[in-house]
Amino acid sequence: MEDNRIQNQIAIYMTNKKLCEFTDKLKLAPVEYYAHMHAQGEEQSDGFRAYSCIGVVLQDYSNGKGDKTVRVTANLSPGFFPFVLSRMQNDLDRFDFTEEKIFGDPDENGLSTVTKLSIKRASVGNDGKRRNYPWCIIVENGRAVKEKTPSGGTHIKSGTYKKLRSVYVNINDLDFFNIVYRTARFIESWELTFGPKLIRDARKLLDDQRAAAQQ
C-alpha cells in the first residue's frame, strides 16, 4: 500500500495544457525575532538562513506529459497575496509585478540559480479587444553569475544570464481571484496557528532574561 503523503499544495489552476500552483513554503522566524513571525533570512539555530515564502509552480503540457512537460518554479513573499487582493478590490484595470532573484552556491561554471517572475493584468489586448483571460503569469528559470552590490546584496552580473526554461499561464479574473484568495486565507490561518506559540515562547524568554538581570 502506498503511503498517504502530505501535500503542500494550497491552490491550483489547471487546463488541459497548463498548470499554475501555489505551495506552502512558510517558515517561522527564530524566537529571537519573534515579531517578524515569518522567517526573513535570520540565522537559524542550525546556522542556515531561512525565508518564509509561497512557492509558485507553472507547468506546460503542450508538447506532452512526462519528460516532455516543461516545469518552472519561483517564490513569492507572503505579503504579495494580501497586496494583490487589495488591488483587485479597487476595480483593478492594470497590474504589473516583476521580480528576479539569484541564489544558491555557484556550480562548476560559476553560475547560480535564477528565477524571473512576472504577474500582469491587462483588460484590453494590443488589438483593442477586451481579454477574457486578462491575467498572465510568467516564470523563467535560468543560470547566471552572482555579483555583490555595494549595499551588500547580490544581483545578476550583466551579460551572464542563460535562460533554461520558461512557462506562461493566462487566467481569467474569477480563477485568479480564487487561487490568490485561498492562498491569502491559508497564510492568515498559518499565522494564527503558529504565531501565538512563537510569541508566548519569546515573551517567556524575555521575562526570564529580565528576572535574571534583576538578581
Model-identified regions with their sequence ranges:
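Beta-strand-rich binding-surface signature
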Residues: 53, 73, 134
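A cross-kingdom feature marking solvent-exposed beta-strand/loop segments within repeated
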Residues: 58-77, 154-169
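Mixed-charge, glycine-accented linear interaction segment located at domain edges/termini
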Residues: 144-215
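Short, solvent-exposed interaction modules
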Residues: 90, 105-164
